[in-house]
Amino acid sequence: QPAGNPDAVVLGLHSFGDFGAAFDAMGPYFADNGHLLVSYDQAGFGERTQQGQWAGEEQLVSEAVYQIEQLYERYQRPGFLVGESLGGAVAILAALQAPDKVAGIVLAGPAVREGIRLRYGWNAAIASAAFIAPGYQLTVDRQPDDPNLAAHSARRLAEDPRVIRNVRMDAYWGLIQLADSASDQAPSLQTPSLLLYGGKDNSVPEAGINHLRDHLADRGEYRFYPQGPHLLLQGPQWQTVADHILDWVARTSP
């Protein structure tokens, strides 16, 4: 919490499998720069895991809209959304639903899929698997010494029991559908945007990011981090990324 009235109000939206603590380091860093950053466990994650089941796009987006509306009521100004991976897709869809309450969105390795090779073929395969074996689990390998992540983030993602490490097939299909929705609706987005992407991102294909850049056009800025991982806000360069976000927020604030 910054001293006095914050210069900007920011809502953090975490990635798939993660929870609100994804912003525990960035929150104080923002506060030191006069900004309020708040986050929460999105439906189906953290303290709200629902045994790993997918909460659904409608609930995820409506909760983000509710949170930003509450911040608007309290601080009487539009807020910013900072979304990582899944959180980026949620940010796109929430901004479309409440454009007057959102001053801008920051999309860090957002879950988007437009233009990827064999997109609909993969969809058919994943949908079939989710229908046949919805509870089948995919294991996510998370190492406490992952060099692609900041030390505190690597430990949290590997050791905190609130992090999902075994992903249900139907939840994975839900994530794919959410990413498709964000991709399909992105051309309608008019909100100022900052798009961030890492050269070591093995989760979101570059084709999806390039199509999103085209849709954002002159309403969006883009930053590329050659050594950046998929989870840019958890990476070793997280403070550099945070500085770029702070600079953009300062220039974009109404």
Predicted feature locations:
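Catalytic active-site module of serine/aspartate enzymes centered on a nucleophile-bearing elbow/loop
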Residues: 219-254
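Conserved alpha/beta-hydrolase
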Residues: 27-51
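Catalytic nucleophile-loop/oxyanion-hole region of alpha/beta-hydrolase
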Residues: 17-20, 45-75
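Alpha/beta-hydrolase-fold enzymes
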Residues: 84-168
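Short beta-strand/loop motif that positions the catalytic acidic residue
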Residues: 189, 195-197, 201
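Alpha/beta-hydrolase fold nucleophile elbow
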Residues: 75-85
